[in-house]
Amino acid sequence: MFDPVKRADMLRPLMLKNGKFLISRIAGTGEEVKEDEDRIAYSTYFKFKWYIDLPEQLSLSPAELWSPNLLGLVDNPLSSSLRDIKKLEFQNPPFSAAFRMKGKHGDPKDYNRAFTIQLSGCNYNCNYCFVPPETNACNPNFSKYFSVKEIVDYFLKAREDFNEPINVVRVTGGENMIVPEFVIELYNELEKIDGTYLWIDTNLSATKHMENVENELKDVLKRRNVGVTGCFKGTCKEDFSLITGAQQSFFDDQFKAAKLFLDWKTDLYVYLPALVYGNSVEQKIDGFVNMLQALNKNLPLRVEMLIIHEYPAAKRNMELKSKEKRPIPLTDQRKVFDSWYNKILPKYYSKEMLSKFCCEVPL
Ligand code: SF4
């Protein structure tokens, strides 16, 4: 098991060189969107995704989309297919962006398509990772350096070409907080473009690099058109280490990073992959909820549990890490979802709080 802080230090000079940032090539990874195939300029390095994608949801009016009936799990989750278990697979970005920009008058469909930039380089080595290992390793054959200005030009071109709104720019990875300068520079460019929302993913491991640019980063993170999703890996230190390949002692660093985001007035959301090892699922989830509550009493209500699909790259990672004795857990993910949403959260929160979208939950 490795030290992810040392790994981040090694990766940083490869991810940021001469004022340009290393961006993963999406083409050829199986992650590109089919419809984009003829838009080579974008789909080679950037990708687009719809977050509300079910036809019956896309046809709803904004008021209908804000109904609490769309929250939580479908009835009988344990006998449903995993793919369909959540009524809404993702609230972020469409709902979070709409809410931050226009409150509940906002239309989530205006923020449903995200122009996604994937930085190459991650200091974890997760066994479920959706990114192909070579794409995530600062490998020059699978990535290219771009200035922020060049990236924003691609975004503007995409906005002109698509006949539906693209108002969200998502920065994912890799771990982008190893080079937080990217987020700062990108926001400063996006600020000049009306109506954009910046969504930042992080694995909550790179506080040192965040603190090095504290003032500029804080200034970006507190803006209304910025949201951050911190992805916790596992509900306890043992599971964290099996999932990420990092030493168990770094489990607590995730909470320190989340605290830093909260202290800096970030609109913070949490992802939790539905991966729990062993039989004590409820006990582990309960313990994790308590750890989040110690940071902020409402933080568990801002969690979106992630379905771990066997996408082509994820399948390769699962097979590779299985050989390193880090297979993904055998626990049925539906059981993890059921425990989180139907058993543990109702133990701590009222019906009224449970019927809020994550973005409505005050921190
Ligand atoms: S899942 Fe995220 S944190 Fe984990 S290795 Fe992949 S990019 Fe890094």
Give the location of each predicted region.
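Short, conserved acidic/polar surface loops in the N-terminal third of protein domains
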Residues: 127-130, 138-142, 181-183, 210-212
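Short loop/turn segments at strand-loop or loop-helix junctions that form parts
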Residues: 118-120, 128-132, 230-236
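Auxiliary Fe-S-binding modules of radical SAM enzymes
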Residues: 1-60, 256-363
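Cysteine-centered iron-sulfur cluster-binding motifs in ferredoxin-type domains/subunits
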Residues: 116-129, 144, 175
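Conserved alpha-helical substructure of the radical SAM core
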Residues: 133-169
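Short N-terminal secondary-structure initiator segments
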Residues: 57-76, 166-185, 206-208, 212, ...
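Conserved AdoMet/S-adenosylmethionine-binding subsite of the radical SAM
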Residues: 155-168, 173-303
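N-terminal [4Fe-4S]-dependent radical SAM core
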Residues: 19-118, 133-137
